[in-house]
């Protein structure tokens, strides 16, 4: 039997038998029960990271939602609800979990649900979310629910992040990260392979955390792989498979734990200030020369004063 349940039953019987005999014992039991209740932690915890502000709009914002099982048992049937609120038509473009699936986004869509299955004790799931800012403030709100080992419902959240157009709130981190795009080759014959390259550099000495790089890529490019190079071996870096974005595009999310700063990386080695992100693809066969576009959009847990977005163009013959 669960120790908390056993204690609860014992305390109830203790109170019933001893209430009339010794009020001091009753008070002690109540204090113990309250202390046990206070020490309990919710089996699910959540956090959210993303941009606090964009200098210019419209802009694509990338968020990362993390759900963690803080209990000692497997949690099952975990689902997430993600809702975007604004007053000007901002919408959710796409969402991608590190396990499981999410609904498709698109223009006019402001809620996306994700089903992520089970979560082992101590394990976490990350969900990358791309939202289109139109002109004003938008707020992403996420909550999670599931079942514990006894099939009792558990929940967490909501957690929220508001992103404003203009100056961020005082005290929030602000960093200028340079971003450039360099597809190779820039001209190629239809049916041939090419590579999309982006370079991220943070030379400010201020560390940027929880970076989300969302690449909006013409869906006629058949993506075969994507990767981040230049990070420390122990750093948390991952890129997901392409997911549908706005019509005619796919989105590839890459999540990067940090970039730049004055301290070492999570592995204790030298600080990484520059990263390269590459996407390998095969071009479509076309009847006339066509220009294909791929735009990389960078967000992190703070504000980028340079609004980093870089577009690569490829001419296919």
Functional labels for PLM-detected ranges:
Residues 115-138, 146, 255-288:
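Low-complexity, intrinsically disordered segments enriched in Ser/Thr together with acidic residues
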Residues 1-20:
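N-terminal secretory signal peptides that target proteins for export/translocation
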Residues 76-113, 117, 210-212, 216-259, ...:
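A surface/secretory-pathway sequence property marking extracellular, secreted
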Residues 40-47, 103, 139-184, 234-239, ...:
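Extracellular/luminal low-complexity Ser/Thr/Pro-rich, glycosylation-prone repeat/linker regions
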Residues 50, 67, 131, 144-146, ...:
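Hydrophobic beta-strand positions in extracellular immunoglobulin-like domains
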Residues 57-76, 190-209:
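Short beta-strand elements of extracellular/lumenal beta-sandwich folds
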Residues 48-52, 97, 114-115, 179-184:
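Surface-exposed, proline-enriched loop/turn segments that connect beta strands in immunoglobulin-like
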Residues 21-35:
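Bacterial N-terminal signal peptides
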């Amino acid at each position: 039997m669960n120790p908390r349940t056993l204690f609860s039953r014992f305390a109830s019987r203790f109170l019933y038998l001893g209430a009339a005999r010794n009020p001091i014992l009753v008070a002690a039991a109540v204090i113990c029960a309250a202390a046990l209740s206070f020490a309990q932690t919710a089996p699910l915890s959540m956090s959210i990271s993303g941009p606090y502000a964009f200098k210019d709009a419209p802009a694509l914002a990338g968020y990362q939602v993390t759900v963690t099982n803080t209990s000692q048992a497997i949690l099952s049937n975990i689902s997430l609800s993600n809702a975007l609120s604004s007053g000007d038509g901002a919408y959710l473009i796409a969402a991608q979990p590190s396990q499981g699936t999410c609904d498709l986004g698109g223009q006019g869509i402001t809620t996306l649900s994700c089903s992520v299955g089970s979560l082992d004790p101590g394990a976490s799931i990350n969900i990358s979310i791309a939202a289109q800012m139109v002109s004003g403030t938008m707020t992403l709100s996420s909550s999670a629910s599931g079942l514990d080992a006894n099939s009792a419902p558990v929940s967490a959240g909501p957690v929220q992040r508001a992103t404003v157009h203009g100056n961020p709130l005082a005290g929030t981190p602000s960093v200028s990260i340079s971003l450039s795009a360099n597809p190779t080759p820039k001209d190629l014959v239809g049916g041939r392979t090419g590579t999309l390259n982006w370079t991220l550099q943070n030379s400010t000495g201020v560390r940027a955390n929880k970076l989300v790089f969302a690449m909006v890529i013409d869906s006629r490019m058949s993506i075969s792989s994507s990767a981040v190079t230049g990070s420390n071996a122990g750093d948390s870096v991952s890129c997901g498979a392409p997911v549908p974005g706005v019509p005619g595009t796919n989105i590839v999310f890459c999540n990067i734990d940090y970039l730049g700063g004055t301290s070492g990386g999570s592995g204790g080695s030298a600080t990484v200030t520059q990263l390269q992100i590459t996407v390998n693809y095969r071009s479509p066969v076309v009847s006339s020369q066509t220009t294909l576009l791929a735009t990389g959009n960078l967000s992190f847990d703070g504000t980028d004063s340079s609004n980093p977005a870089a577009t690569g163009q490829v001419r296919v013959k």
